[in-house]
Design a protein with these regions (language model features):
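Bacterial Sec signal peptide processing site at the extreme N-terminus
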Residues: 8-32, 41
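Boundary/linker segments of alpha-helical solenoid repeat arrays
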Residues: 45-49, 80-90, 143-150, 185-222, ...
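TPR/TPR-like (Sel1-like) alpha-helical repeat modules
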Residues: 70-81, 121-122, 135-139, 169-193
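Short loop/turn and low-complexity linker motifs enriched in small/turn-promoting residues
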Residues: 219-464
Length: 464
């Protein structure tokens, strides 16, 4: 009975397992979510430790606890850096279930943990450490790119370079700010637009022109004015900048996808796993003729792998308004939903191939166990069938997208309003900020609302 309960528990997706925490976040009860995170026993195993650090760090940030939040993001960074594969556990996970692997994060999750560290530091007014954290964000993306064979992937983070430019900008280092902004522009043009459909932020264009004009890069000013069809504008006298980040909604969650493959015997010890509808054929080496017959006798094999499901954000766009009703539109800087889908799509064949290999290894183990002990073989056969489960773990408190703007406000205490627009309403959130001469004020805000789930094509679905 204990075994059966354990297997039923394992069948729940990662999203279902933390339903209480998610409900607290959805209802805006961040204090309760923080308390539940402390009691979440399923976070304690090492294989889920990184997710505990990431989710706890995000909730603490939402609660305005920047210092405590960064302690968890530092732990997350060290965990990823120090992780070394446990080959015994790794072998067991191939045979039983990928969920037994230690989770070290999707590539974009490893990159974006440094976004939160950076935002925490800028909100604390610590620009030097913010610069270090942002450079770690870029270094992480470069390190991940070194391991990618197919370069037509999410491999460079445009928003990281954009954010780096904002920090240099705030420090008065306009030369390095311009370089960072220009690097960001190139990545938006070369990677983000064709791969993710993310447009170049209008604010980035304005910042490139402004910093170029500030350091008298006349040729660059003329070049980009023509390219952007904009005029370079400097900071107005008596004003100082406010950089406002809006984390909109919540990023996608992982669910399980599965398809059936038909098995066909091949030559030289191989069995072909074929799905005609998807146009897929995976030749897997099985071994002797007896083992091949056992695998092909099954005829149809179910294979599971993870897929993302969108949490459709309630708010579609937003503007910032000052006390004089000047309007500053927020641009999408990072479409995390699109990045998540692209990252998983890029390795779909690898995921399916590993799932098929896992099935073949399980069948070999069952056959070997039956030779030794019929009862043990039967038990392993049941375990093999029950354990065919995709790894649905992911960092579930990332936003759907990161949006931002730069507003120029008069020196002194100011009241600003963030207006977020849905299909049928506008919500207003008020902020009081102290604008100081010669300083950049950084603010960040999260909206959590979303309107159900959708597949990668935008079709609405019922997840659970």
């Amino acid at each position: 009975m204990l075994f059966a309960l354990t297997m039923l528990s394992a069948c729940a997706t990662f999203y279902q397992k933390q339903a209480d925490v998610m409900d607290a976040v959805y209802n805006g009860n961040i204090n309760r979510a923080e308390a539940l995170m402390n009691d979440a026993r399923w976070h304690k195993p090492k294989r889920n430790r990184l997710l505990f650090y990431l989710n706890k760090g995000t909730i603490l940030w939402m609660n305005g606890k920047n210092i405590e939040s960064n302690q968890y993001f530092l732990k997350a960074d060290l965990f990823v850096e120090d992780y070394r594969k446990n080959y015994v556990t790794e072998l067991a996970s191939v045979l039983i279930n990928p969920n037994y692997n230690t989770y070290i994060g999707e590539s974009f999750e490893q990159i974006l943990l440094h976004y939160y560290a950076t935002i925490n530091f800028v909100q604390l007014g610590d620009l030097d450490n913010a610069l270090v954290a942002c450079k770690r964000m870029i270094a992480t993306s470069q390190k991940i790119n070194d391991y990618l064979e197919n370069k037509n992937k999410y491999r460079r983070d445009a928003f990281a370079h954009n954010l780096l430019g904002m920090i240099y900008d705030a420090q008065g280092d306009y030369n390095n700010a311009f370089i960072a902004y220009r690097n960001s522009l190139n990545i938006y043009k070369e990677d983000y637009k064709p791969l993710l459909g993310t447009e170049i932020p209008l604010q980035l264009k304005k910042d490139i022109l402004r910093t170029a004009k500030t350091i008298y890069f006349i040729d660059e000013v003329e070049k980009y004015e023509a390219e952007f069809n904009l005029k370079a504008e400097l900071l107005p006298e008596g004003y100082a900048p406010l950089v406002f980040f809006w984390n909109n909604g919540l990023g996608p969650v992982k669910d399980e996808n599965s398809v059936n493959f038909v098995t066909y015997p091949s030559q030289n010890g191989y069995v072909n796993f074929v799905n005609v509808e998807l146009g897929l054929n995976f030749p897997i080496y099985v071994g002797n003729e007896e083992d091949r017959k056992k695998v092909t006798a099954l005829n149809i094999v179910r294979v599971a792998w993870p897929k993302y499901v969108t949490r459709v954000p309630t708010y579609k766009n937003a503007v910032l308004k000052d006390s004089l009703n000047n309007v500053f539109k927020l641009d999408v800087g990072e479409d995390i939903n699109a990045i998540a889908f692209k990252s998983l799509d890029d390795r779909m064949l690898k995921e399916i191939g590993e799932a098929i290999l896992r099935f073949a290894l399980k069948q070999a183990a069952v056959a070997l166990a039956k030779k030794e002990n019929e009862g043990a073989g039967a038990a392993l056969s049941i375990l093999s069938a029950a354990s065919e489960k995709a790894d649905t773990r992911n960092w579930q408190f990332l936003p759907y997208s990161i949006n931002y703007t730069r507003a120029y406000l008069p020196i002194g205490k100011q009241n600003i309003v963030l207006e977020t627009s849905s299909n049928d309403s506008i919500e207003k959130n008020n902020f009081f900020v102290n604008i100081e001469k010669g300083k950049t004020n950084f603010q960040a805000f999260q909206t959590l609302q979303f309107d159900g789930f959708a597949d990668k094509y935008g079709n609405r679905i019922n997840l659970y």
